[in-house]
A protein has these predicted regions:
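Positively charged n-region of N-terminal signal peptides that target proteins for export
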Residues: 1-5
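Bacterial N-terminal signal peptides
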Residues: 6-16
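Sec/Tat signal peptide C-region and signal peptidase I cleavage site
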Residues: 17-21
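Mitochondrial intermembrane space
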Residues: 22-133
Length: 133
């Protein structure tokens, strides 16, 4: 049984194609420059892509995630009903709670990504470009 599991995992790893990591478009190494690039992104989706490319994988990502939410939320928050806004807030809190009991800066990064991805998904669903489709 263990042998089959090891073989199956090995086969999946061999068949998986590695994803090409995007380079961070921000030439400066500072956190503020990365946050500014996210805030000034033309679209919410591009803001999330910049976060993904420029992420630290540690607690520094909390600032990047906040910048994504600052960029994305104006696209959809005014259009949400009260019930939809409560659902969005619950989703954001769920992201906080998901890794709250875990220690380590990596888990703060996971929380930041969860919240940023939630904001980007809501912007795609309820934002101005969503109605144009």
């Amino acid at each position: 049984m263990l042998c089959r599991t090891v073989m199956a995992v090995s086969a999946m790893l061999l068949l998986a194609t590695p994803l090409q990591a995007k380079d961070c478009p921000v030439q400066e190494f500072g956190l503020e420059a990365r946050e500014d690039a996210i805030r000034n992104a033309p679209t919410c989706r591009q803001a999330l892509e910049i976060m993904q490319a420029c992420a630290y994988g540690a607690s520094g990502d909390t600032g990047l995630g906040a910048a994504v939410r600052e960029r994305c939320e104006p696209d959809f928050l005014p259009k949400l009903s009260k019930a939809q806004k409560r659902a969005y807030d619950r989703e954001q809190k769920r992201c906080d709670q998901k890794y709250a009991r875990q220690s380590g800066t990596m888990y703060r990064s996971f929380t930041a990504f969860c919240q940023a991805q939630s904001a980007a998904a809501h912007a795609a669903r309820f934002g101005a470009t969503a109605k144009a489709r």
